[in-house]
Amino acid sequence: MGQKSNPNGLRLGIIRTWESKWYDVDKKVPFLVGEDFKIRTLIKNHYPKSTISQIEIKRLKKSNDEFIEIDLYTSKIGIIQGPENKNKNSLINKIEKLINKKVQINIFEVKAINKIAVLVAQNIAMQLQQRAFYKAVLKSAIQKALKSGIKGIKIIITGRLGGAEKARRDSISMGVVPLNTLRADIDYAFEEAHTTYGVLGVKVIINHGEVLPNKTIADTRQIFSSQYENKKNNNKRHFVDKKNFKKNTS
């Protein structure tokens, strides 16, 4: 029943890896998992939405001191760093006070923002909170995602749509979204939009294609460069001088 399970968790250990990369004694694991959860919630509350797509936490040990390395994947490096790295340094101070450990933050830029389910869901939720019409928001999000070179997308929205008295569910899908195919690179995200007439739930499911043998998710997603932009640049018309054109045709 792949449609009733989280597509991200269903593919862990098959084509996806864990976002918390560390190993420790069994007694410490519950405490460290809770610590990771606190770090993630603090980072999400520190920055506005539609900025961070992924948070990776690595735990290292130097001598007897534990050292935490955090990788942030974002579409807006300027907001994350701030002027003279003020936002980044303030975040490091908050995390170090929370867990009493040394922290290092690495920031990586993501360019193809319309291919990442988390950023798409956050963008939709933000527009719904600004009282935009939900059907127009969903259609524009799907068009932008398809232009970026994905194989398929499905968006599900639930709640009091358009301020209706009765809550209902609406969905739009384009392309192929095989949830039961474990080798398919499915990116899933859920966000909540807090509006004046209630909370709306937004689910985004994006299919990046199949992960073939000897390949990884990075090969299918190509989040650092858009396939659509490369095709668009190749299809540009090249104007030739009339004199040279006449000489070539004769």
Swiss-Prot record:
Gene Ontology CC, one term: cytosolic small ribosomal subunit
This protein's UniProt keywords: Ribonucleoprotein, Ribosomal protein, RNA-binding, rRNA-binding
Stretches assigned to the KH type-2 domain: 39-111
GO biological process per UniProt: translation
GO molecular function: mRNA binding; rRNA binding; structural constituent of ribosome
Domain of life, source organism: Bacteria
InterPro entries xrefs: KH_dom-like_a/b, KH_dom_type_2, KH_sf_prok-type, Ribosomal_S3_C_sf, Ribosomal_uS3_bac-typ, Ribosomal_uS3_C, Ribosomal_uS3_CS
Pfam name, any one: Ribosomal_S3_C
Subunit structure and binding partners: Part of the 30S ribosomal subunit. Forms a tight complex with proteins S10 and S14.
Protein function: Binds the lower part of the 30S subunit head. Binds mRNA in the 70S ribosome, positioning it for translation.
Family listed: Belongs to the universal ribosomal protein uS3 family.
Official protein name in the record: Small ribosomal subunit protein uS3
